């Protein structure tokens, strides 16, 4: 059953990839601030597949749609749409299916490279069929950290990267590419930005929290969170403390 759910998410990612390949207008949609035409095209492609399955949908690009199955897919059709609009090959379709018990399946597909990260509840986390896991880093001074935004002063890390797509940044923590992730912009992210990657991180053995201790699993279009992630509990505590001090 969970594999069927994951298969649905792969089908959605395939549909978005096909629609994106036909996009020629990379400018603003004119419908709301920060939205590109490619976001609208990707969202329509995703909704076409999801509606057929009967699941509910919570998308960044449209209103909540109730379904008939008791499950909801939280989706950002294109996370990192500014990157996509400028030709930066770091943007993804991020999806997490949620049932009455919480996240049950997740997929993050880099639509520029074809790389895909996924997880099912209790089944670990994977990248293109290879099981993934985080590093064992416990010291900020040894860490390479993905970030959203620029802090007013360094947080003690060895190096940092600001790449512009939180869904992929968090997957890189799950896969041991980054040791951690810090959101330096207050209340910047909706649940569609991070939930798929949070599930992938947790199934991989990495740790993710909201800066203020709030639940990250929230089916509310208006809710915003400040995610912090790390390979180990020790590093997470240090990153949370450093971020709280900004």
Residue ranges and their predicted role:
Residues 52, 132-246:
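An extended, acidic
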Residues 46, 50, 93, 97, ...:
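Buried hydrophobic packing segments
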Residues 56-61, 75, 84, 162-164, ...:
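General beta-strand structural signal in soluble alpha/beta enzymes
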Residues 16, 39, 81, 110, ...:
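Residue-level signal for inorganic ion chemistry
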């Amino acid at each position: 059953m969970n594999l069927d759910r994951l298969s649905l998410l792969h089908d959605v990612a395939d549909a978005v990839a096909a629609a994106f390949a036909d996009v020629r207008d990379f400018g603003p949609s004119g419908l709301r601030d920060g939205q590109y035409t490619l976001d609208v095209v990707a969202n329509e492609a995703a909704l076409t597949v999801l509606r057929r399955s009967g699941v509910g949908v919570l998308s960044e690009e449209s209103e909540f749609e109730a379904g008939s199955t008791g499950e909801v897919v939280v989706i950002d059709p294109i996370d990192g749409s500014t990157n996509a609009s400028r030709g930066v090959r770091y943007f993804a379709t991020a999806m997490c299916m949620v049932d009455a018990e919480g996240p049950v399946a997740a997929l993050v597909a880099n639509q520029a490279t074809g790389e895909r990260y996924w997880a099912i509840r209790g089944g670990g986390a994977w990248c293109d069929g290879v099981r993934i896991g985080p590093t064992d880093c416990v010291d900020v001074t040894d860490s390479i950290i993905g970030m959203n935004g620029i802090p007013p002063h360094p947080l003690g890390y060895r190096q940092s990267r600001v790449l512009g797509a939180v869904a992929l940044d968090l997957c890189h923590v799950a896969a041991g590419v980054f040791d951690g992730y810090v959101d330096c912009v207050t209340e910047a992210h909706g649940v569609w930005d991070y939930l798929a990657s949070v599930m992938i991180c947790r199934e991989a053995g990495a740790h993710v929290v909201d800066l203020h201790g709030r639940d990250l699993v929230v089916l509310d279009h208006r809710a915003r969170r400040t995610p912090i992630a790390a390979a180990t509990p020790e590093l997470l505590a240090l990153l949370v403390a450093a971020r709280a001090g900004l």
